[in-house]
């Protein structure tokens, strides 16, 4: 794919790279929240569906699955839909974090229903564990090379997350709560925790067939 979005000469409109109206998201209300989405490429999507249809070549996941007669398991996990889908390809399974629901989701291109372990993970609402907490520095500020440069006029205060540490996540009620998570290590932790559940519950690497778990931290 040439980018996150492009102008489609046939339709005459800008197209988001993984949007596909043929394959809805499995979770209702999990698509882009236009009122709270800060990523212009996400807002450009005109469809609530997602798939790898725009990937015109075979991916590593596809070749691995093909080379093992479909026995290899391939899973892509990311905070972004385009990250997970590009790694999972056409023959794997992609999961990504929905800022609209605070859950990991996929589309009907990949699955007709969630495995129990995915439903259990989402039911526990792991994103809410960060409510009433903050993103703080790991060490004392004066131990960092540019520790005295935390506040600069050209820094953006993204959706009210603040320009200086600590960055407060708030009580979880803000429409930007999940966005703030994805802008911080909390988003990476959620992705990692979900990927670990995929590793265990899908029994990746448990036999002699090579499996593929791709994880995108963004």
Predicted regions mapped to residue ranges:
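His/Asp/Glu-rich, glycine-adjacent segments
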Residues: 1-209, 218
